[in-house]
Amino acid sequence: MRTHVPKTAMPGWIEAEGLPAGVRGGMATRRFPGVSEGRWGPANFGEHSGDDPEAVACNRACLIEALSLPSDPLWLRQVHGVGVWVEGESIIGNATERIADASVVRASRAPAVILSADCLPILLASESGGEIAAIHAGWRGLAAGVIENTLSVMHTDPRKIVAWMGPAIGQAAFEVGPEVRAAMLINDPHADRAFQRGDGDRLYADIYQLARNRLELAGCKVGGAHFCTVTSQAMHSYRRDGAVSGRMATLIWRV
């Protein structure tokens, strides 16, 4: 498993490979150009991490400028749930405050974006490029169906959707209890192959495999990186740094 960030044209940016023509996406890591200092620096995009709010606002502005984004990203108030915010509609979740863990965009060029610091970021795009989505998938959201909820409100047949999985916690660092395995098995009979035995009743979960199972079952074409946010100092990691951890931004937009 790779634990480093590859060199790209822009420091701290991991480009999402395999997206359709006319669609761009990727992750802005801790090393992206920004103004945060200390444990958050140089780039932290999370507002509730203990960082200076003015620094976070500046980092978000830098993101827009550095990537030449067509508009402000559609920031969500994430709650580790299954809510999906759909641009221009109120379907699943709170549309007014954007309280959700996924967003779908089809009517504009606004970037869909999620924040993460170990949880799995997933980007979706229709093969035509006319519909895009971003998903924040922790184990609770995966088990409860955040992927399925997102696909259910998209107008595109899942068999014509491309998925990209961004950097998340690696299996060797993701120690969990038996309740996580039990929750995953409820709606995924193949989830067992994503767990390795640890000491006692402890297990090590492969969040990439757990998400891949569900995406492929739906018919999506799946790709993406296999990093470990915990072991890479270029990444923010809640499990490694605790409540003071910053947040990375993973976004997708139509160019």
Protein language model features and the residues they cover:
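Active-site microenvironment for binding and transforming phosphate-containing groups
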Residues: 1-255
